[in-house]
């Protein structure tokens, strides 16, 4: 496949830079209760961010030790440093697009904080989202180069809730094209995402971009979607907490679907506390998503409050133990099994009763817990295009009939896909729904849901424990073993860090709980996490140099909190070079295409816009401009 790179450059004017600087200078000097103060404000520095949790970042922001601008610049610096090839590493290729408005949004949120306004529990926190979440200010590609300029008018419900809670949407992450492959992340829009624990290995999929990015410290947390393993798989293989909630607890409105019978939205984080916090923001009824009618069955407002390091005491947990065959292409079976055995002993040490579940067999999973999805993919994608107000790429809809409607077939006809021919054939074999085959599959899946619910009751279980993946990440494969349990039945599941093999490959413990017992599952997960603390950050993406605190000017806020930033027009694309990144040998080769964060506003390690604000207020800036560089490549 040949690639023609496109580069789009968005330049902010000197006036915009000045406004941002003044807004930030206001944010750095909160008003005294007795009027103006002449005392210097505390120095602000860009903090170390490797494994910085959301709760850690909030504490720094609340104390005034850092600002959202400094924090955002720090994360953008990491994307710039590690996403494209560097040193002897191929780079992660985890980000499709860094938000050109991230720094200006951060400055606005800093000003709001200084003025005493806090939007919500994520105020000023940068968050990553998978590139199938619609965003009003950035294109949504679902990993397809053909959708490079597909721009929705509105945010997805999940992104809307993040923004309402005060989050900064930092970047859109790479994904398996149309979320199809769950063992690797490869897209025509960005190429292959690599695992930061060993960049020769797969990052799993389909949310591998979010997984690799969060693991590497591009942001404290991110969102993925999961149809069968796409949150828990990348989380297990990159030592993260990956939470797949009860089906219907979180809205999927505005997310490019794969199979709506199984699609969920959920968090990928470095701590259980952060996962619980994000679930409080994401969970809840959405009138545009009928499946969320079940969201009101549980109180999702106290997930964090309910976390306890004694939650496992007295819990009855079934340990699923199957025999597996050694496969040279999927290494680590023996060591992963030992790690999961130890994880289960750790559950017991925290007071859980571990019981065998001999009736939870392969046959029970394959014959009873069946999927009703994968017969609705093509029609569901077509429905998304038909019902989502968006600007389509020029000429794309006219490639197939009907010429006035954008369809999955149009995207495939454009010829830029990384999907295999047999994948495309399977998508397009899906008949319009309803149809008899689909109705029969749904009926069988509904019966499996009842059987799963009854299994928990009959065995008096609070949870099931199993390996997220029985084997380790490899160059061509990093999958899951038990994704069917949550995906096909809709019960909540979580992958938790369970240690590392002798080769440094991460392992994950998967827990599944009864339907709508999300609070209990999060609490049990927290107890296990606090007792084990397995997570270690990857060595291939170390902390960047941290500068000494930068003295900040003293000023009173002179303006009301700034409005939501508008999207700036972008310049015409220009060509850039395309780095070559190894792709899995068993899958179509596609080079990782260059991305870019917002350009640095100073030397490496400075506080970016904070330093710019200081220079502006001090009168030494003149006509400075911020340059936001966006580089993505389109296949042709």
Mark where each language-model region is:
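Short, well-ordered alpha-helical
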Residues: 37-141, 145-148, 179-182, 294-295, ...
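Glycine-rich, small-residue loops and helix-cap segments
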Residues: 64, 124, 422-549
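Short glycine/serine-rich loop/turn segments
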Residues: 85, 122-265, 290-293, 320-322, ...
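Short helix-loop capping/hinge segments that flank enzyme active sites or metal/cofactor-binding pockets
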Residues: 123-142, 311-320, 375-450, 497-506
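Gly/Ser-rich, acidic/histidine-flanked active-site/gating loops
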Residues: 133, 264, 291-378, 382-390
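Structural helix-boundary/capping segments
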Residues: 216-321, 346, 488-553
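Extracellular Ser/Thr-rich, low-complexity/disordered mucin-like segments
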Residues: 577-614
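C-terminal membrane-anchoring or membrane-association module
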Residues: 613-636
